[in-house]
């Protein structure tokens, strides 16, 4: 992949936050394509001389599916009007009740896509593509029930690695982050607990459930992971974004984890929508010094936030609950 310029906007004058929102948010509105009721919780990666993405688009019947999109600058997007049509050796794998919350990463020679796949309940679907035109679906990673499958962008000790959040069949009122390994992207094992919810009130914004967000990327300190945390309030679930640093060689070991959230729902498009009070990270573009994070806002639109990687690392270490 070619190294390209990530989307970027400097910190506003007077802003002291570690991360800040794009001034023109939302980047993608709910009616970006004719059929959509909402577009959110979507994945973006560098591709050729621009960017490609896999987008969660719920239609006006609120059927959940994933669509491809392309952009020159990571801000202005051309999203397909039709969902991805997968190819698979086992045709049963193509049938699903829903597909949502995709993540995408490049590993070695192809792009890998994961998503929440409705196969007798929520599990993690896996597919690969070389060109974002043809997609080849593999076996589901796990039995139901599981969500938030996030692959590491390189093998660890010769094996693929994936974060996930085992759950139940409903709108999960619990959940911790686990890691699993695979020699071939088909058979998964060596399951280890990575992060658990925090006890109330030590870090209450993440005391109900947590889940991996964007694909982690390697820094001098270890793997930097953005994740979501949830608290149950009188007004329902509230989703915010935090960060953690995982050991480079043994990512089941958490070195640092934020006590305070990086971004919580505060802007109107995060507070109001189909599911109010949600900031849900799904993708991060970085150039070694800076990062642009794409997140779902109120389960309705896509927002973007920026930050300097070293400042985020410093914040993660300074506020760590570990």
Swiss-Prot record:
Database matches in InterPro entries: Glyco_hydro_beta-prop_sf (IPR023296), Mannoside_phosphorylase (IPR007184)
Coiled-coil annotated spans: none
KW Glycosyltransferase (keyword) present: yes
EC category name: transferase
Keywords from the named record: Carbohydrate metabolism, Glycosyltransferase, Transferase
Reaction(s) this enzyme catalyzes, per UniProt: 4-O-beta-D-mannopyranosyl-N-acetyl-D-glucosamine + phosphate = alpha-D-mannose 1-phosphate + N-acetyl-D-glucosamine
Entry's Gene Ontology molecular function annotations: glycosyltransferase activity
Record EC number: 2.4.1.320
SUPFAM superfamilies: Arabinanase/levansucrase/invertase
pH effects: Optimum pH is 5.5.
UniProt keyword Transferase, yes or no: yes
Family matches, as PANTHER family: 1,4-BETA-MANNOSYL-N-ACETYLGLUCOSAMINE PHOSPHORYLASE, GLYCOSIDASE
UniProt family annotation: Belongs to the glycosyl hydrolase 130 family.
Subunit: Homotetramer.
Function of the protein: Involved in the N-glycan catabolism by catalyzing the reversible phosphorolysis of beta-1,4-D-mannosyl-N-acetyl-D-glucosamine (ManGlcNAc) in a sequential mechanism to yield N-acetyl-D-glucosamine (GlcNAc) and alpha-D-mannose 1-phosphate. It can also use beta-1,4-D-mannosyl-N-acetyl-D-glucosamine-N,N-diacetylchitobiose (ManGlcNAc2) and N,N-diacetylchitobiose (GlcNAc2) as substrates.
Protein's name according to its UniProt entry: 1,4-beta-mannosyl-N-acetylglucosamine phosphorylase
Species the sequence originates in: Bacteroides thetaiotaomicron (strain ATCC 29148 / DSM 2079 / JCM 5827 / CCUG 10774 / NCTC 10582 / VPI-5482 / E50)
């Amino acid at each position: 992949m070619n190294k390209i310029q990530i989307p970027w906007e400097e910190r506003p004058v007077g802003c002291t936050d570690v991360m800040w929102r794009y001034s023109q948010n939302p980047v993608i509105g709910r009616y970006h394509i004719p059929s959509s009721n909402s577009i959110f919780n979507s994945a973006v990666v560098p591709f050729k001389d621009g960017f490609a993405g896999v987008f969660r688009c719920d239609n006006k019947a609120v059927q959940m599916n994933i669509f491809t999109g392309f952009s020159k600058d990571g801000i202005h997007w051309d999203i397909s009007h039709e969902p991805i049509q997968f190819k698979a050796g086992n045709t049963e794998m193509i049938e699903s009740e829903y597909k949502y919350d995709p993540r995408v990463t490049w590993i070695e020679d192809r792009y890998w896509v994961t998503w929440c796949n409705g196969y007798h309940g929520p599990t993690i679907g896996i597919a690969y593509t070389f060109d974002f035109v043809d997609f080849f679906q593999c076996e589901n990673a796990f039995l139901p029930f599981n969500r938030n499958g996030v692959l590491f962008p390189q093998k660890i000790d010769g094996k693929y690695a994936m974060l996930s959040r085992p759950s139940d069949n409903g709108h999960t009122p619990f959940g911790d982050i686990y890691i699993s390994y695979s020699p071939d992207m088909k058979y998964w094992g060596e399951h280890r607990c990575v992060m658990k919810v925090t006890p109330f009130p030590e870090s209450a914004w993440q005391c109900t459930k947590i889940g991996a967000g964007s694909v982690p990327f390697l820094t001098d300190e270890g793997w930097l992971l953005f994740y979501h945390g949830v608290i149950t309030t009188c007004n329902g679930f509230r989703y915010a974004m935090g960060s953690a640093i995982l050991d480079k060689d043994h990512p089941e070991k958490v070195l640092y984890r934020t006590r305070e959230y990086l971004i919580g729902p505060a802007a109107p498009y995060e507070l109001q929508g189909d599911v109010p009070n949600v900031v849900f990270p799904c993708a991060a573009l970085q150039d070694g010094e800076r990062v642009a994070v794409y997140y779902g806002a109120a389960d309705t639109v896509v927002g973007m936030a920026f930050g300097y990687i070293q400042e985020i690392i410093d914040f993660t270490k300074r506020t760590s609950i570990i």
